[in-house]
Amino acid sequence: MSAAPDWNPATLTQRVFEILRDEILDVSEGFTPQSNLVDAGLDSLAVTQLMLSIEESTGIWVDESLLTPENLETTATLALCVHSQLD
């Protein structure tokens, strides 16, 4: 078995971005970690799918109370929220 990845804000941002881009959203080439997620099509169903994918991919569970508009604004803000659950 390999060791768990060292999840830091940068690696989490990249992983969350990949999940959003490849599994959750139908996005254009211009989609970046700083793109607004609601503008990119994130809705409540997509949030549920996203959080399940993040937990499955990283092993990090995020409390629903942290899924605020501020934390779901961009990939980067969401990754920081996920990272906060490691403390």
Q: What name fits each language-model region?
A:
Residues L67, L72-Q85:
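C-terminal structural segments of small proteins and small subunits
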